[in-house]
Amino acid sequence: MAKFSTQNNLRGLAKFVRQNRGRLLIGYLSYDLAYELHGLRTSLPANQQLPQIYFLAFDTWRQITQQEILTANLPTTPGTQNFKPKLTLPQYQKIFRQIQTYLRMGEIYQINFTHPLTGATDLSARTLFAKILAVNPIPNALYLEGENFEILSFSPESFLKIQNNQIETRPIKGTAARTAIPAKDLSLKKSLQESPKEKAELNMITDLLRNDLNQVCRPGSVQLTAARLFQKCPQVWHTYSRITGTLATSPLAALLKMFPGGSVTGCPKKRALEIIEELESQRRGLYTGAIGQIDPQGNLDFRIAIRTIIKKQTRLSLQVGSGIVIDSTAEAEFAETLQKAKPFLQALA
């Protein structure tokens, strides 16, 4: 196994990827790389003290089922743990009013504002991963062990998938809570489907991602193949679009050019990044970066690093957010962020 760990050595990453062609690479890019990639400065404190770029290269691996993970790692006795948001609703409302000012001035049309939750546990990271997977059994969950940290990612959002020179992105925008009562669950889905606000939000981000794809694809190859689809997660409904194209550059170059994802920044992207830097209380670290794999053939599959826990010793960090537009309300957006954290809170209860 080979390892690449650095703060911002993008040339070193490209060399590592080339040298390990034919192996399976698994790793992540921290959101904080956006400062270098987009020429921004930050005065925000780091929140996780992780490498900004971290990859492992494997010669051998095997596939296992989620049931194998649960059987091997679910605890026979409960552990002690807790999770709570750092931001209160009144504090969120104050920041929300500042965002609305930027929206009314036309500086941005949509922004993804996020806030952290912190916790602690005496459970091992593998046990915690299994507990969350039991209540949130999504495909493509990812567990990664670093030198002094573990990552537990349950992201539902595909950022970039590149196979045989074909590229696809599936930005998520639009969220509704789910319930165990079938009739009410369908009613919540219908409300999401009919919401002008949620439709507009997805359209904005779809246009942004389509423009981003045009920068890395052959002219005329970018297509919106699905304008609005539904994704059913255990705790929430999401809507997403699907955009495809034919790659005109290397997979890694495309990943870096489009980084970070438009669905977790806003539009226009550069100004949204600047306002995020102004209003959020700490650097995002891995959160809303990209996490995934490069297969032995050079195909790439990365997800947006949302619904992702960082564990360092007994300390846990999680971040949640939502897209805010001119007709959003602070109360609804704050509730949406906590709804997204529900699987983690439920697993840690």
Describe each model-derived feature in a short phrase.
Residues 1-349:
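Extended alpha-helical targeting/anchoring segments
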